[in-house]
From Swiss-Prot:
Name of the protein in its database record: Homeobox protein Hox-D4
Organism: Mus musculus
Domain of life: Eukaryota
Residue range(s) of DNA binding per entry: 152-211
Short sequence motif Antp-type hexapeptide: positions: 131-136
The gene coding this protein: Hoxd4
Amino acid sequence: MAMSSYMVNSKYVDPKFPPCEEYLQGGYLGEQGADYYGSGAQGADFQPSGLYPRPDFGEQPFGGGGPGPGSALPARGHGQEPSGPGSHYGAPGERCPAPPPAPLPGARACSQPTGPKQPPPGTALKQPAVVYPWMKKVHVNSVNPNYTGGEPKRSRTAYTRQQVLELEKEFHFNRYLTRRRRIEIAHTLCLSERQIKIWFQNRRMKWKKDHKLPNTKGRSSSSSSCSSSAAPGQHLQPMAKDHHTDLTTL
């Protein structure tokens, strides 16, 4: 009851704060800042007690928040940490050291020396195909010497009119060619020896068919078969005669 009556009867006046608009205009803050900086300059000349030695460098007031106007700033020594809210953030010009950047995962892979790519262990290396001598085409002179694959299917040779005319002329004089003459004709007509040989074989068969001549190969085979069949009968007759004479003598 005594406290409440004292508060009621006292001459306490509520503080009058300026409205927010005055803060935005800067008049109130500007006057207070001038008073604060003036008191800060006055506090720099203040000599503290002899507990801590005075440093050689001059002291500068902080621009940030600090003690109120009229208070002196203590000198900073080597073992004393500055007090106040601004002491936690350091000097205005100083910056916190940035942390070192974390190494990227791809940077390590690039720094390592890259060697030749190794095939996976499950896959085997392809071996070159083996080409045996019988798989090569060597019986034709006009074949590509660099070709090492299998023998392709032979195509029918198309002779030109000039080649056929020269071959017919040669066949009219000689139905059978020697090796030397065959080589000469092959070089003259730009053909191979095998092509010349096959053409002459076919031309001889056609000539025999046109003249109705018997095939020499068929006649020789038939004559040999007849001779072989007649030989056993000749040997059987003397044996039968000898057997008959033996029976009569008995």
